[in-house]
């Protein structure tokens, strides 16, 4: 059996939403016994649509993830089993929050962390260069070794470079 793709789940969801819309219309225009049979048919249709969606979305224990080139599936339409969402995003949706907010906050946090790390790297590089300069002037016999270490780590003994 071919794996269920994201587009298939999308179609199943559209069917469920369409059935809900039809039920809403039938309830809104309810005229009594003559529309009761139609409403019953729509409710049965909803049950079938939900069962189909549930069956397609259920985890497949026999599923083994393989590269898209081997399965012949488009990367734009991956198998449902291969999609992994962070639990935090699921919590956001469960709390009726927009998952885009989580993504934005996550990106901002990563940017802040990257800026802090960049600052630390620049501070350590500057410290390395100053330390090397002071060591070379205080211990001339070690100057060649200090220069070798500084150059290997991307620095400059004369204080002009920053790795």
Curated annotation (Swiss-Prot):
Chloroplast among keywords: no
Gene Ontology, cellular component aspect: mediator complex
Localization of this protein: Nucleus
GO molecular function ontology, one term from the record: transcription coregulator activity
First-listed, main subcellular location of the protein, grouped into a coarse class: nucleus
Protein origin, superkingdom: Eukaryota
Keywords: Activator, Nucleus, Transcription, Transcription regulation
Polar residues composition bias: residue spans: 63-72
Family statement drawn from the similarity comment of this UniProt entry: Belongs to the Mediator complex subunit 10 family.
Self-association state and partner proteins as the record states: Component of the Mediator complex.
Record-given protein name: Mediator of RNA polymerase II transcription subunit 10
Naturally occurring in which organism (per UniProt): Coccidioides immitis (strain RS) (Valley fever fungus)
